Design a protein with these regions (language model features):
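Generic structural signal for residues in well-ordered beta-strands
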Residues: 1, 93-95, 222
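Glycine-rich FAD pyrophosphate-binding loop
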Residues: 1-15
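Catalytic P-loop NTPase motifs of RecA-like helicase/translocase cores
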Residues: 10-11, 133-134, 232
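Conserved N-terminal helical subregion
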Residues: 21-138, 143-156, 203-207
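Conserved FAD/dinucleotide-binding core of flavoprotein oxidoreductases
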Residues: 58-72, 76-81, 117-119, 160-231
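Short, low-complexity Ser/Thr-rich regulatory SLiMs
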Residues: 103-104, 184-186, 239
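FAD-binding beta-loop-beta segment adjacent to the flavin cofactor pocket
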Residues: 232-245
């Protein structure tokens, strides 16, 4: 296989967290994921559901989905990308490639790139995000992302920043127009936090102002979760592709 990347490099900067299902870990273990430094990943055993006031509602036992060959796992995205780059992608990724057009010739898919190069393949999988131009090329139809009416705020914190939640588990805190997901990403007591907030406009309001008018308005005791370096992204969606070639 070959991966054509539209960017010039892989972003290996320290990133936020990612959750991997037990089955995805089972597959990754086939290329050595189980040999990754144990300090760089975590195996939460439960998903705890809370009200906005941090009163526990119920929990889901994630260990029931585990097997001897795969456990539900959390870690930093950057650690996962580095692992994939070393184990899988080092000789299989070509950068700075953007699709100009495609055509089927004698059962093969011919890909023509903007830089004038081309390739013939049996299968083509497009996975370049909501702002994908490749999807428009394949469908021969313009796809314009639309604002979903929500934003995502992300940060990382230490377990010292929480007291009424179980830092060993995944925590889902549900408010009226927002929810928070908090989970450990390694053995060093680092936690990933993502907060999804309904917001009608995508105006660049200060993050603190958005939080004060939404999630913190319902529970000021959550302030400690947002003392770190906060990053905000508006959430976009786009129409689903319908063509298979």
């Amino acid at each position: 296989f070959v991966i054509y990347e539209k960017g010039e490099i892989l972003n290996l900067d320290e990133g936020f967290g990612i959750q991997l299902s037990a089955y995805s870990v089972f597959i990754l273990n086939k290329i050595g994921f189980n040999q990754l430094n144990k300090n760089e990943k975590y195996h939460p055993s439960k998903l705890d559901f809370y009200s906005i006031n941090c009163n526990k509602i119920c929990d889901l036992d994630l260990s029931k989905f585990n097997s001897t060959n795969g456990k539900y796992t959390t870690l930093k995205r950057s650690i996962l990308i580095k692992f994939l780059k070393e184990k899988l992608l080092s000789n299989s990724i070509i950068f700075h490639k953007k699709i100009h057009d495609i055509e089927q010739i004698n059962g093969k898919i011919n890909i023509n790139f903007i830089d004038g190069s081309s390739d013939k393949v049996d299968y083509l999988v497009v996975s370049d995000g909501v702002f994908s131009n490749s999807k428009s090329v394949i469908e021969k139809k313009i796809f314009k992302p639309s604002y979903y009416g929500a934003i995502a705020i992300r940060t990382q914190i230490k377990t010292q920043g929480i007291s009424n939640l179980n830092s060993n588990n995944i925590s889902l805190i549900m408010g009226s127009d927002a929810h928070l997901v908090l989970y450990p990403i390694n053995q060093r007591k680092e936690l990933n936090l993502v907060c999804i907030i309904r917001k009608k406009s995508k105006d660049n309001d200060p993050i603190k102002t958005i939080l004060e008018n939404t999630i913190l308005k319902e529970n000021k005791n959550l302030t400690n979760l947002f003392r770190g370096d906060l990053k905000l992204w508006p959430i976009y969606t786009t129409g689903k592709p319908i063509k298979s070639i």
